[in-house]
């Protein structure tokens, strides 16, 4: 049977960065792997960030969101059936930061997937400097992603103070309590950033498995507040985009923006990757890109956001 891992993490937590490290570790062990990008929106930016992993022993597949729950589940199941015929040793599923974890377990119990795949690990990435106050819906997503995790990695731990790390762990456990989950997290948490993880750390992660935990479910239609907005072919410089994103993330009239990501060309015509969260905004060179900016958050106001990006 093919081992399959789920790697979750709330918006902007650093899942894709961790997956690059984890995939390289698996490739160094001689494994043949497939990575399935399962995004919330209709455009998948993270696929471009993983392109350098592609090779004889690593293939990338994609499911775009932007559809209803049943359609998305059907696409996920169909893609896993196709990948089950490719001879992989391991499949890594990276969903969006807004994901119903139950879908993963439910689909893998369907025939014929229950005979082809064995769940390996559920790994959750959490920002070590997690916002102290989130909405009820956001806390639910945080709890639902952590509840079944065999290991939890604190991204950006090297940038966080000891107090911030402890506050993040307290927040995780508080979110679990709010959904009536009995689990409390401590030993499962690796207080290291992905860049600091050693081979021995990855050996532990590879064997961490998952936990079948119960908690009070919130129906997806109760989370209508989560949105993703797409802005294509913007006529804006890289420097100006970074400035405008910083302003709109501080403007409550735009809604609650969790994450902004995408690509833009600089003055020399080279691609730059934008990645913005509540903690930082970065603009880094990248080999290839797509002229798109994606804004993800709660109850977003498109007209207000568009003014920042297009005027």
Predicted regions and their residues:
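C-terminal engagement modules used by replication, chromatin/transcription, nuclear envelope/ESCRT
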Residues: 288-296
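Short, Lys/Arg-enriched, disordered terminal segments
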Residues: 1-2, 311
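Flexible glycine-/small-residue-rich
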Residues: 37, 126, 276-278, 297
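Short, hydrophobic beta-strand segments that form beta-sheet elements in well-ordered domains
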Residues: 34-36, 261-264, 295
């Amino acid at each position: 049977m093919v081992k399959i891992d789920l790697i979750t993490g709330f918006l902007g937590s650093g899942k894709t960065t961790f997956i690059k490290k984890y995939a390289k570790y698996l490739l160094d062990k001689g494994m043949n792997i497939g990575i399935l990008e399962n995004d919330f929106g209709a455009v998948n930016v993270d696929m471009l960030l993983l392109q350098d992993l592609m090779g004889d022993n690593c293939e990338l597949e994609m499911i775009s969101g932007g559809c209803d729950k049943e359609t998305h589940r059907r696409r996920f199941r169909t893609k896993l059936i196709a990948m089950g015929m490719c001879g992989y040793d391991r499949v890594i599923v990276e969903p969006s930061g807004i994901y119903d974890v139950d879908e993963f377990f439910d689909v893998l119990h369907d025939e014929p997937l229950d005979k082809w795949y064995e769940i390996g690990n559920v790994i959750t990435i959490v920002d070590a400097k997690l916002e102290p106050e989130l909405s009820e819906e956001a806390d639910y997503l945080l709890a639902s992603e952590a509840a079944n995790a065999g290991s939890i990695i604190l991204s950006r731990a090297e940038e966080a103070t000891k107090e911030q790390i402890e506050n993040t762990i307290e927040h995780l456990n508080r979110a679990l309590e709010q959904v009536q989950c009995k689990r409390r997290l401590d030993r499962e948490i690796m207080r290291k950033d992905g860049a600091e993880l050693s081979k021995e750390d990855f050996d532990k992660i590879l064997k961490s498995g998952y936990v079948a935990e119960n908690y009070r479910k919130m129906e997806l239609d109760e989370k209508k507040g989560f949105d993703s907005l797409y802005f294509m072919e913007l006529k804006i410089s890289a420097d100006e985009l970074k400035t405008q994103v910083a302003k709109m993330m501080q403007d409550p009239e735009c809604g609650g923006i969790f994450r902004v990501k995408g690509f833009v060309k600089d003055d020399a015509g080279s691609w730059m990757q934008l990645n913005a969260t509540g903690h930082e905004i970065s603009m880094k060179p990248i080999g290839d890109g797509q002229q798109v900016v994606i804004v993800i958050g709660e109850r977003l106001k498109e007209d207000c956001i568009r003014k920042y990006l297009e005027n």
